[in-house]
């Protein structure tokens, strides 16, 4: 059986088998020179007929079904149009390996977002990934802020307490997206195999149109009462019939003596050429329906993940934020601080404040940015391309994939940005121990302006649209 990569060469072979099948129906067989020769009758052999790759000789043959005559060239053209029109749709289907590469790219994000990682007994799909111990620094920073007593530090402490939960949810979202890439990989792996089998069966079905099979012969001889009588018709088998008991079935003797074996059932096979074609048409529809249904399910899964990631966090009855959120509510207390007392109301070593800022800026934020970057590694739309009739359109589930990875990328990047901005606030507070309140107010104003210019979301769910800035 030819594989999917051989499909472009298999298509003309199917055309040729279909033409030969119909020509056999009219009593014409290949002459060994590219043309066809009819069976000789009482009036002698009919004139030879030019083959499909030879100049048109204008020959017509009797139409045994409808009467009159039929153009031989019309037979050639019919199959030369029907077969490629159907099978060319399957050329250029997505490569399963490309979706493994996408899954591996998402794996990078998982290694950054997961504190524990994932292990399994079977890692043939590279499904395992290491945990990220750096995320534990969020707890260290939160504990440090707890002793500073400022309103802003309390706000940011609450933010960091949610950090591990939210980043864990982001990891779950990334894992769900990665699972969809495995589904796409298997869809195209299976579909390519199905197409290869479909093409091979179509070629074989036309090749055997009108053949006399083992079952046909069995049917003819089934009316004979005994094995001995059947084989007795053939002198060469008289020595075989002597020891054969009458209880042995005709079928068994036929198989054992003649060596005839029933061929594997070809779901497309039929005695007539048009019946075979009708079977192929139905199989084509069924195959494309299966691909379409499967990819639609993947597309729906990606859309559902997007809806969860992009939804505004719910507020519980006790006023706390729903733990299922995928992005962090902005710690407006610390980012709107006007003086150092908003952050620190106790005596703190400035070096400790600076160290806390460094943990946010140099440790936690880069981890988030690495994760975000892996979800925005460039335009991968090309790997989804195929004929629009295959799957759910010419780019399949790409738009849903793009939407959800872009949304998750933005949420993770937002987390990194806010860690940086909080670090800037802490640096300004540390400087205040030397420069005074007026200096810290100016430094904090610069942080506020940086946030506004970034057009970052407000943390209330969703992103600004139409280029609108989010003021503070």
Annotate the PLM regions.
Residues 199, 206-213:
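Hydrophobic alpha-helical transmembrane segments and adjacent short intramembrane/lumenal linkers
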Residues 210-262:
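Membrane-active amphipathic alpha-helices enriched in small hydrophobic residues
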